[in-house]
Design a protein with these regions (language model features):
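Polysaccharide-binding and catalytic clefts of secreted carbohydrate-active enzymes
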Residues: 2-175
Length: 176
């Protein structure tokens, strides 16, 4: 039912889903209901919860810079929060595929918009992970672990920035 409600699939487009407050709200309520039910019925047998989302339930995607109305809106809000002025829309998918230095490294002098876009992309996914961990922790006792499959930074070079895991230090530092 959830995939029919939105114009994207959170399995393959987690950054788009994570950019959507409605998706976050609905999914959070579903998770909280699931945890409450599980704790009530099986709580004494459960020692950990794994929070999963995105590609293969590991919070990644290979979107290569595709955008959407909802992600453009989130980009503008992110830029505003970070006092960055880089335009109304995210950089085009085709421009993100080109880098000044041997087509591998962006030039901060001329391609800062691309660097900041990928920072936004990775942060929006990490923020979703942390959001769900915090909401889950409120319902789960401290003696139970909460985990995620996240933080793969040794993936193929042409997919690394769009993979969504480059804000792993933020996630790993979480107390939740």
């Amino acid at each position: 039912w959830l995939t029919r409600r939105f114009a994207y699939d959170s399995f393959s487009e987690i950054s788009h889903a994570a950019s959507d407050k409605d998706w976050l709200d609905i999914t959070t309520e579903w998770m909280k209901d699931f945890i409450s039910y599980s704790e009530g019925k099986y709580g004494k047998k459960i020692i950990a919860y794994i929070l999963s989302g995105g590609g293969t339930s590991e919070w990644y995607e290979y979107d290569s810079g595709r955008s959407s109305r909802i992600k453009n809106t989130a980009w503008r809000k992110w830029c505003s929060r970070n006092n960055i002025s880089l335009g109304e829309d995210v950089p085009s998918e085709s421009s993100l595929q080109i880098a000044s230095h041997e087509n591998v490294i962006y030039d901060p002098q001329t391609e800062m918009h691309k660097i900041q876009y990928w920072r936004f992309h990775n942060e929006i996914i990490a923020d979703a992970v942390l959001h769900f961990a915090k909401e889950a922790r409120n319902l789960i006792s401290l003696d139970k672990e909460i985990g995620v499959f996240f933080g793969y930074y040794l993936v193929s070079d042409n997919k690394l920035v769009s993979f969504g895991h480059l804000d792993y230090e933020h996630v790993f530092a979480s107390s939740d």
